[in-house]
Regions:
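Beta->alpha loop/short-helix hinge microenvironment recognizer with preference
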Residues: 1-391
């Protein structure tokens, strides 16, 4: 029994047997290798020496994989800080787009196409409805983030959209709907359903879909048609969460959710020779936390379901935040609303300065005497220092 275990420990214990008995994609295999070898020396080391006392320190490089639980904090802080320049001190709304669970096998079997279709359907829904004079009649600003997991690491693909509560009309005048979201949820639901199903049907008609694993039955024409009819008939349930209270609330949310992975180390509670216990929210019981125990191989299977396709972009910016509009349009919105400009704190800082600012830790100071630490030349990195010389 191991109480203080990490996801890396779980992979070391259970991944080899899982790999030998399961089909694994190249992206999943790469992520597993990175997680198991992060900060072990497999990705190189940096050796530094104190100018004053000669004490040496060895730093093992991280894997920098976006699925690794040990590698998210630093890129997250830099990304969120850069977004400060894009966020206005104005109301924002949080819209979540979900799909019927009947589609999950097809989506998992065609991740690149059908994740992309989620972005297309969500963004087209928001942009087209916002541009309609019946609702707002403007170009708006929003960020879409794909998550593929539920609290138990089940497969649950959905889009989080952070939507500015107003926009610019054709004359570049600002329009908003006060504190209320400017789009009816029922209209969003029907529009999103129509757009997603239309793209799914088009991919099917163009013979672009694959049917693996639990999606295999849908190779049959009539079974697939029945699935389409079932999903068309269902009421899709996107929902709008409580609005954000200004720019800082948006930034805090982005910091919490943008670089999330399926599960983090603090939720791992126990590991035995054959099982893993982790905490999860029970949404059938008012979102209270509970502990779940599953086999080690099942834990690996669930975790790897959420490794995105190679080079797949999970965070996307639209309309006023698109690269061709952002510099001019966001500045115009800021001037109209009288918002102060948020300046990036980390933009021109090097890594030691960022670590010093965020974590109050000076990695250029010797932990023994406080002297200045300097890096050793690369060719000396693999000269193992004697134990008494280590800080």
């Amino acid at each position: 029994m191991s109480k203080d275990c990490t996801i890396q420990d779980v992979f070391h214990r259970f991944y080899p047997s899982f790999e030998s008995t399961h089909s694994i994609s190249p992206a999943q295999r790469k992520a597993a290798y990175h997680i198991m070898n992060c900060k072990t020396g497999a990705f190189g080391v940096n050796v530094s020496v104190c100018e004053d006392c000669g004490c040496m320190s060895v730093h093992y490089n991280s894997c920098r994989d976006r699925c690794c639980p040990m590698c998210q904090e630093f890129p997250k802080e830099k990304w969120v800080d850069a977004r400060r320049e894009d966020i206005l001190d104005a109301p924002y709304f949080h819209v979540v787009f979900t799909v019927p669970e009947e589609l999950n096998p097809i989506i998992y079997s065609n991740q690149k196409f059908l994740y992309t279709a989620l972005y297309h359907a969500a963004s087209d829904t928001l942009s087209e409805l916002a541009a309609d004079n019946k609702y707002l009649g403007t170009d708006i600003s929003y960020i879409c983030i794909l998550h593929t997991w539920g609290s138990t690491m089940n497969f649950h693909p959905h889009i989080h959209a952070i939507v500015l509560g107003g926009g610019l009309d054709v004359k570049n005048h600002w329009k908003d709907n006060g504190k209320d979201f400017f789009l009816p949820i029922k209209v969003i639901s029907k529009t999103f359903r129509g757009k997603y199903m239309a793209e799914l049907k088009q991919l099917w008609e163009n013979d672009r879909l694959e049917f693996h694993g639990s999606a295999a039955p849908y190779k049959n024409y009539y079974t697939f048609k029945e699935l389409l009819n079932t999903c068309y008939a269902k009421e899709w349930i996107p929902y709008c969460k409580k609005p954000f209270d200004g720019a800082e609330s948006v930034i805090r949310y982005l910091g919490k959710y943008t670089h999330r992975i399926a599960i983090s180390n603090y939720r791992i509670k126990d590991m035995t020779e054959s099982t893993v216990t982790f905490s999860a929210k029970d949404y059938k019981n008012q979102g209270l936390w509970k502990e779940i125990t599953i086999s080690g191989e099942e834990f690996i299977r669930r975790f790897l379901m959420h490794v995105p396709p190679k080079r797949f972009v999970r965070i996307r910016h639209y309309d006023l935040l698109s690269s061709r509009n952002k510099k001019k349009k966001i500045t115009l919105c800021r001037n109209i609303l009288g918002c102060k400009k948020y300046i990036s704190k980390l933009k021109d800082m090097d890594a030691p300065a960022i670590i010093r600012l965020l974590y109050n830790k000076d990695i250029c100071k010797c932990s023994s005497c406080g002297g200045k630490i300097i890096p050793l030349p690369t060719e000396q990195h693999f000269i193992k220092p004697k134990p008494h010389m280590l800080c």
